């Protein structure tokens, strides 16, 4: 256990950030899952709608540093390609 006051503060800050990041990452996975489920159901309209909802969430997570910018770009690219297969 940390003995310095500053180290104790960092532990508290890290816990707060961990909970916040976990919440955002979980929401991110939900949005991605919604797009994939719509594609599996072969519902083009719902898939496009889900994709339009997912892209800003993915980009915001990258901006906040929760996921890497390249990972965000890769997710958007793959989801877009997946939705475009429906036509």
Curated annotation (Swiss-Prot):
The keyword Ribonucleoprotein applies. GO terms for cellular component: cytosol; small ribosomal subunit. GO terms for biological process: translation. InterPro entries: Ribosomal_bS20, Ribosomal_bS20_sf. Keywords: Ribonucleoprotein, Ribosomal protein, RNA-binding, rRNA-binding. Residues 1-22 are annotated as: Disordered. It comes from the Bacteria. One of its GO terms (molecular function) is structural constituent of ribosome. Binds directly to 16S ribosomal RNA. Belongs to the bacterial ribosomal protein bS20 family. This is Small ribosomal subunit protein bS20. It comes from Geobacter metallireducens (strain ATCC 53774 / DSM 7210 / GS-15). The lineage of its organism: Bacteria, Pseudomonadati, Thermodesulfobacteriota, Desulfuromonadia, Geobacterales.
């Amino acid at each position: 256990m940390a003995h310095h006051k500053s180290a104790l503060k960092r532990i508290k800050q890290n816990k707060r950030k961990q909970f916040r990041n976990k919440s955002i990452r979980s929401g991110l996975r939900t949005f991605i899952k919604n797009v994939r489920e719509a594609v599996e159901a072969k519902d083009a309209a719902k898939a496009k709608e889900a994709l339009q909802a997912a892209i800003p969430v993915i980009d915001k997570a990258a901006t906040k540093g929760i996921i890497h910018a390249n990972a965000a770009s890769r997710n958007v690219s793959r989801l877009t390609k997946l939705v475009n297969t429906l036509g």
